[in-house]
């Protein structure tokens, strides 16, 4: 399991005042890459991002937490689930996204 945390800044926000979906997709891909490289002990490539579900928005100055874990390992590929949360000042987290990334 790997966890990364980000503070949402103006450069991460779209024209509607929410986290830009493309930015979140980049963070998901990077985290899935780290998780799978640690498991494989070598280089990997993203094959696909499946089932990318946006459940809620995130806004300027929100703390974003991404948690990645391997859910399947095959002979030539693996699947990484990445859950994304907004964390409040008390440490409570609410899910805003879940994605499954296939790495080869």
Predicted segments with their positions:
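HotDog/MaoC-like acyl-thioester-processing domains
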Residues: 2-4, 59-60, 71-104
